[in-house]
Amino acid sequence: MRMMKNNNNETVMVIGIDHGYGNMKTATRCFPSGVARYDKEPIFQNNLLVYNGVYYQIGEEHKEFCAEKTQDEDYYVLTLAAIAKELDGKGMNRAKVHIAAGLPLTWVATQKEDFQKYLLQNEIVDFTFHNKEYHVEFAGADIYPQGFAAAFYRLQDFKGINMLVDIGNGTMNIMYINNSRPLEKKCFTEKYGTHQCVLAVRESLLKELGTVVDDLVIEQVIRTGTADIGEKYLAVIRKAARDYTKEIFHKLREREYNPELMRLYVVGGGGCMIQNFGEYDKSRVTIVRDICATAKGYEAMTVRKIQRNGGMLI
């Protein structure tokens, strides 16, 4: 979160938010993209958000993949939670907020306007999160291409031909950046993220061992390469993850990836799959492990935009 004066001399808080299918990320926070709605006050209130008289448990249940993030209220409620977490980190509960967010590369052109309207559906919002009251006024919202934002800070490193791949929970975004310039005509979005890997692993476990393993265990193995479970289960999970990672590289080759002719930059939560289970030349592949990199990029781009329009950091 960055505090700025805009060209109207108003104090605004620029907050970058990465609306992932697995996790919501800001520049400093990460939490599961789950929302459970209750009409009555629930018993457990660890992550309770109250908005418009409705109770929401944040981080509960799994957010299913949806081609349009505006199709229900979940991402709006998650946005309020993300804003609250950033404000709370600075000891604040009232602010005028300018959101910096994004969409998958090939969705930006068709969905940008609708997502912007969705995020700005209310000029002023009052809600409660973690038993703390918040008052938020919205100053604006900018929508950027997902993936590219994570590379914003290091564009100077992209000399020659480069492929950038952002592996999220629900999608994999591919972009070419040549001599620090993104190529708009060479941007692709595949429905091939870490959640699909979890599904593939789950199927392998059921087929080979006749066992259902909790997704939390599978996700831990994908993220770290291991877990405190029996070796036979670990072996099946690792093999399925390796097979899935091979398929990722196959899809990259379908988009003309050649490790001898270009460098590969991997961002997003799925980078751990490449690191733990991929076969690649480490001198030609860079894995950015900062899961908040995209949110930081969104934030930086909006800061630059406001500065160009006469605003300043304070």
Q: What is the meaning of each model-derived region?
A:
Residues 26, 174-176:
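Conserved blade-register residue in beta-propeller folds
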Residues 202-208:
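Acidic, metal/cofactor-coordinating or nucleic-acid-engaging core segments within structured domains
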Residues 167-173:
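Ser/Thr-glycine-rich phosphate-binding loops at phosphate-binding pockets of nucleotides
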Residues 1-164, 181-196, 208, 216-314:
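Nucleotide/phosphate-binding catalytic cleft detector across ATP-hydrolyzing
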